[in-house]
């Protein structure tokens, strides 16, 4: 599986250390193992996890601004854990309301010795942080409007950003953003061997 990952990274133009590659593969191994009992993802094949989970997450890394991030509705740690592996100098709070997912995240944290993640079991509207985050990240979590509404208390008011990983560009969602929120940028992502479109929508407060 390491060879497959290296091929995908080369296609994407991403350079990682051997340790980072090994951590990503170990994470996929754990996800595949736990998935049989906990049903953490609908993706069943480890090599497909490399494409649809690992690569789909880490291609976002160059566009993140800051060092403190929260991944809301992280599920089994996506995109937070892959991003934490490729950005060891950043810190990621991984938020999910389901206990079984958070238990998995804590096991990953322990086995991979990830010191820059903090798994938290909570609903997003009930969670608060001081200081606020540089970025709020979501992948398949909610509509842009709901994401911003539910998470408005989390980012730093001036420089904080909302990062929403989307498939096909949600043009209708972009027209009904809450008052005081505007589009910072929309980036078309290149994920090797992934069918369909991928976009990163970055939102900011006015």
From Swiss-Prot:
UniProt subcellular location: Cytoplasm
The protein's Enzyme Commission number: 2.1.1.170
Predominant cellular place of this UniProt entry's protein: cytoplasm
Residue positions binding S-adenosyl-L-methionine: 73, 78, 124-125, 139
Reactions accelerated catalytically: guanosine(527) in 16S rRNA + S-adenosyl-L-methionine = N(7)-methylguanosine(527) in 16S rRNA + S-adenosyl-L-homocysteine
Gene it is expressed from: rsmG
Function field: Specifically methylates the N7 position of guanine in position 527 of 16S rRNA.
UniProt keyword list: Cytoplasm, Methyltransferase, rRNA processing, S-adenosyl-L-methionine, Transferase
Entry annotated with the keyword rRNA processing: yes
Primary enzyme class: transferase
Coiled coil: none
Pfam families reported for this sequence: GidB
Family that this chain belongs to: Belongs to the methyltransferase superfamily. RNA methyltransferase RsmG family.
Protein name: Ribosomal RNA small subunit methyltransferase G
Molecular function as annotated in GO: rRNA (guanine-N7-)-methyltransferase activity
NCBIfam families reported in the protein's UniProt record: rsmG_gidB (TIGR00138)
InterPro entries listed in its UniProt record: rRNA_ssu_MeTfrase_G, SAM-dependent_MTases_sf
Domain of life: Bacteria
Annotated Gene3D superfamilies: Vaccinia Virus protein VP39
GO cellular component terms given for this protein: cytosol
